[in-house]
C-alpha cells in the first residue's frame, strides 16, 4: 500500500466520513444486498450494482485483487417470487414454477451486470442454499431471549435489544413497523419482525424446529454475510431505501446472535433515483428495466450501450439523489465519444483518479481527471496506458465500434472525395468533410505513400457510436 492514499468513506452508522481501516488488510470483506429474483432489475437497481463495483475495483487496487472478498446475495425465496410464479406459470406445480422464475430472472440479472461492466463478486450466495445457517441463527436468538414463537411464527423481540435503531437513529417508542413487516396482535411490540414463518402445503418450505416453513426477509442476509465474511466484517452496502427496516434488522439479528458491538464497521448507502424529475413507478409509466434500456427503444426511442448507462450513473456522487434522463445519457455518450479506445495498452492508474475515488468514491472528480487524461492520450499515445488503467478503476471502457459494410463504404467514399478536393486546392470543402466525419467520431490522418509520394488518408473510429 506504499504511496496509496488513505481511503475515506462515509459511514451511515456514524454519519461521518472517516479513514477506512480494514479489520485485516489481507482479507478486506464487503457485503452488498443483491436482487430478489422475481422480476428483471430496474435502472434504480443498476445504481448499487455499479457503485459498489467501483468500490470493489478500488479496494482491489489498494489492497490487491487476492485480498478482497465481495459477497452479493441472490434472494430466491420470497412471497413476491411465489406470486409471480403463480401468475406466469399457472399450469405448473408451484416449486417448478418458482424455479422457472428465479432461474430466468437471475440469469438476466447477471447478464445485465456484465453489460454494465461489473466484475463478478467473489461469491454470490443464494438464500435457498443457506437455510441451515438461518435456522442456526434463529436458534441462538431464541436461546438468548431475543426471539419468541407466536402463532406459527418466530419473531425478533426488538425490546430485547438496548440500542435497536443504531443505524436509522429511530426511537423505538416512536417507530412504526417497516413496510414489509405486518403489525399483528400476536407481536409483543409493533416493530417485532418475522424470522421464520410456517408454509402452507403448496408453498415452498424447509423443515425446522418450529415446523415446515421459510425464512423472513432480513435473516437471509445475516446468514449469508456471516457464512462468507464472518460475524463482523468491513463494509456493508446497499440502497438508501434499505437502511430501515432491512439493514437495521440485519444488525439486530447478527449482533444479538453473535454478541458483537457491530455487524459491519462501515455502512454505505447510495441515494435515490428518479426518472425525468419524477419517482419511477409503473403507475407513472416511467418504470424501466436495465434490459429495456439496453435492448429496446423504450427510453428515448433507441437502445443505450452499457458503458453509457454506467458512466451516466457515475456522473453523480453516489450519496446524492440522481435524476435519470435522456439528457444525462446523451451527456455521458458525448463524453465517451471523446475518449480514446485503448485496446491492450497497459500502465499505472493516474494518481489524480485514484485520489478522487479514495475520497468517498468521488466519481465526479475522478471522471474530470479521467477526461483530462483522455485528452492527453488522444494527442499522445504514450499516455494510453495510464488512461487505460485509470478508466479500468471506474470500469468504463470506450468500445471499438463494429461498422457494417455500407457505413465503411460510405466513409471511404467521403475520404476519396476529400482527397479530390485537396488536389483541386478546394480546402474549405475538404475541411468541411473532415469536420463532418469528426462530428461522427471518425478521425482522419493524412500522410504520404512511401513508394509513390502521393497523399493518402487513413481513418479510425474514436467514439463509442458512429
Swiss-Prot record:
Gene Ontology molecular function, alphabetical: ATP binding; cysteine-tRNA ligase activity; zinc ion binding
Example GO BP: cysteinyl-tRNA aminoacylation
One matching Pfam family: tRNA-synt_1e
'KMSKS' region, short sequence motif: residues: 279-283
Domain of life: Bacteria
Signal peptide positions on this chain: none
Protein residues bound to Zn(2+): 33, 221, 246, 250
Motif annotated as 'HIGH' region, chain positions: 35-45
Cofactor note: Binds 1 zinc ion per subunit.
First-tier enzyme category under EC: ligase
Binding site for ATP: 282
Keywords: Aminoacyl-tRNA synthetase, ATP-binding, Cytoplasm, Ligase, Metal-binding, Nucleotide-binding, Protein biosynthesis, Zinc
Disulfide bonds: none
Catalysis performed (reactions): tRNA(Cys) + L-cysteine + ATP = L-cysteinyl-tRNA(Cys) + AMP + diphosphate
Cross-referenced SUPFAM superfamilies: Anticodon-binding domain of a subclass of class I aminoacyl-tRNA synthetases, Nucleotidylyl transferase
GO cellular component: cytosol
Subcellular localization(s) per the UniProt record: Cytoplasm
PANTHER family: CYSTEINE--TRNA LIGASE, CYTOPLASMIC (PTHR10890:SF3), CYSTEINYL-TRNA SYNTHETASE (PTHR10890)
Complexes and interactors: Monomer.
Family: Belongs to the class-I aminoacyl-tRNA synthetase family.
Protein name, entry field: Cysteine--tRNA ligase
Organism expressing this protein natively: Rhizobium meliloti (strain 1021) (Ensifer meliloti)
Amino acid at each position: 500500500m506504499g504511496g496509496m492514499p488513505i481511503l475515506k468513506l462515509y459511514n451511515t452508522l456514524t454519519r461521518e466520513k472517516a479513514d477506512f481501516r480494514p479489520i485485516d488488510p489481507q482479507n478486506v470483506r464487503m457485503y452488498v444486498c443483491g436482487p430478489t429474483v422475481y422480476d428483471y432489475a430496474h435502472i434504480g437497481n443498476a445504481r448499487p450494482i455499479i457503485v459498489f463495483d467501483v468500490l470493489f475495483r478500488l479496494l482491489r487496487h489498494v489492497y490487491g485483487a487476492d485480498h478482497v472478498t465481495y459477497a452479493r446475495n441472490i434472494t430466491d425465496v420470497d412471497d413476491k417470487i411465489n406470486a409471480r410464479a403463480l401468475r406466469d406459470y399457472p399450469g405448473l406445480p408451484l416449486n417448478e414454477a418458482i424455479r422457472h422464475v428465479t432461474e430466468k430472472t437471475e440469469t438476466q440479472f447477471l447478464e445485465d451486470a456484465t453489460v454494465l461492466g461489473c466484475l463478478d463478486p467473489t461469491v454470490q450466495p443464494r438464500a435457498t442454499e443457506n437455510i441451515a445457517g438461518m435456522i442456526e441463527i434463529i436458534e441462538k436468538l431464541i436461546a438468548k431471549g431475543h426471539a419468541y414463537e407466536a402463532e406459527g411464527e418466530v419473531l425478533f423481540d426488538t425490546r430485547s435489544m438496548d440500542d435497536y435503531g443504531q443505524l436509522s437513529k429511530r426511537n423505538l417508542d416512536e417507530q412504526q413497523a417497516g413496510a414489509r413487516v405486518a403489525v399483528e396482535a400476536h407481536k409483543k411490540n409493533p416493530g417485532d419482525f418475522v424470522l421464520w414463518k410456517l408454509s402452507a402445503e403448496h408453498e415452498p418450505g424447509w423443515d425446522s424446529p418450529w415446523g415446515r416453513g421459510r425464512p423472513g426477509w432480513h435473516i437471509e442476509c445475516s446468514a449469508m454475510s456471516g457464512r462468507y465474511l464472518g460475524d463482523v466484517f468491513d463494509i456493508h452496502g446497499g440502497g438508501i431505501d434499505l437502511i430501515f427496516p432491512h439493514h437495521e434488522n440485519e444488525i439486530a439479528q447478527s449482533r444479538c446472535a453473535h454478541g458483537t458491538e457491530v455487524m459491519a464497521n462501515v455502512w454505505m448507502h447510495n441515494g435515490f433515483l428518479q426518472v425525468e424529475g419524477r419517482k419511477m413507478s409503473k403507475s407513472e409509466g416511467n418504470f424501466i428495466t436495465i434490459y429495456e434500456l439496453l435492448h429496446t427503444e423504450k427510453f428515448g426511442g433507441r437502445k443505450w450501450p452499457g458503458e453509457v448507462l454506467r458512466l451516466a450513473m457515475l456522473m453523480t456522487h453516489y450519496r446524492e439523489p440522481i435524476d435519470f434522463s435522456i439528457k444525462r445519457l446523451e451527456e455521458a455518450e458525448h463524453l465517451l465519444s471523446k475518449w480514446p479506445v485503448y485496446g491492450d495498452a497497459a500502465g499505472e492508474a493516474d494518481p489524480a483518479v485514484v485520489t478522487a475515488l479514495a475520497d468517498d468514491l468521488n466519481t465526479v472528480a475522478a471522471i474530470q481527471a479521467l477526461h483530462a487524461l483522455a485528452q492527453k492520450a488522444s494527442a499522445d499515445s504514450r499516455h494510453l496506458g495510464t488512461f487505460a488503467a485509470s478508466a479500468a478503476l471506474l470500469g468504463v471502457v470506450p468500445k471499438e465500434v463494429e461498422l457494417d459494410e455500407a457505413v465503411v463504404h460510405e466513409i471511404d467514399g467521403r475520404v476519396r472525395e476529400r482527397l479530390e478536393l485537396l488536389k483541386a486546392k478546394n480546402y474549405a470543402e475538404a475541411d468541411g468533410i473532415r469536420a463532418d466525419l469528426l462530428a461522427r467520431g471518425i478521425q482522419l490522418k493524412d500522410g504520404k505513400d512511401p513508394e509513390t509520394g502521393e497523399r493518402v488518408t487513413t481513418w479510425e473510429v474514436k467514439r463509442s457510436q458512429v
